[in-house]
């Protein structure tokens, strides 16, 4: 028996011991490995085991119960577990010594190894060090990952790398780190045990102590809330200021503007009425004696007369009877004194041939129309002296829409006194409806 256990007393014992050792490490290692697997019962991971494994005693603190967390509905997630493969010799040797080792977990916050504590994973060690985990560890070691030897860190490496992340719990409130006595809220949602697949479907490991940066600024009680109108006050005020600079000048719509568009003529902007126009007819009697002057032409101005062309069409009958006779088309220049202003106007009097007839016009009247502010419907009057044959021009504004052509008569206090200077009296002729 001593020879069989490895004694060196006899050659036969040495041969049997060497042969048994060769059976374990040589050609019989495959059969030996499967016998060990058959001898290990399949563990059932219960709820309390999952809780202990999520939060080992003294290593990871439970999150704070005061943190508001929305409950998540259970959705089964299945993870493909790698199949068993041929293991190196050092893994078989370490698998036999698993009961002699202690687990060391690294805290994710400071990456410092925790002290050796009594093992709380006796029921999970056969599962964590089985062929599925070893094959996964071997694959990870070939990829030059941090955990090259997965025996002490097999479960942590498998859970953090192979398990699906929970998209809800990404970070915890800082009180989860400071409160070690808080009740755990990570529990399995299963009412019944589901065997080995309980780990791969319901077990969840969250990196609770790794702070996830937020793209939004922190909100505090001292933060002020602004409305959209308050935020956009600056640009809106600037735009209003720019628009106000443009719109400061008032827009005045005149009657001649709309009427000139109908006749396809340029705009005629009337000038302001001079202060001398507010004088009564008594001032005019000083310059003109109504006994000497008489009205030879009256016309109600049209759109073309007050247009920018500066031309007034004269009534044919009155023009041929009282104005100078025209022998040439080019016409003649006529000087007329202003009835209200101390100025003299130079107009060109000419005619146009029109179907074997003539149309008489008075040109260069734009300045006179602007000076008196004449518009469509106003009255244009020409006086002629019976003694000197001087011409006097007058423009009168229409007082009412239904009043046309004021009648200008000579008014004297004493008609029998011929030496008395008489003034002009205006009487309105109402339009017949």
From Swiss-Prot:
Any GO CC annotation of this UniProt entry: nucleus
For region Disordered, the annotated ranges are: 1-29, 216-283
Q: In the record, what terms sit under GO molecular function?
A: DNA binding; DNA-binding transcription factor activity
Annotated Low complexity bias? 216-229
Cystine pairs: none
Among Gene3D superfamilies, the record links this protein to: DNA-binding pseudobarrel domain
Sorted UniProt keywords: DNA-binding, Nucleus, Transcription, Transcription regulation
Report the domain of life of the source organism: Eukaryota
State its location(s).
Nucleus
Q: Which PANTHER family match?
A: B3 DOMAIN-CONTAINING PROTEIN OS04G0676650-RELATED (PTHR31140:SF12), B3 DOMAIN-CONTAINING TRANSCRIPTION FACTOR ABI3 (PTHR31140)
Q: What is this protein called?
A: B3 domain-containing protein Os04g0676600
Question: Which species?
Answer: Oryza sativa subsp. japonica (Rice)
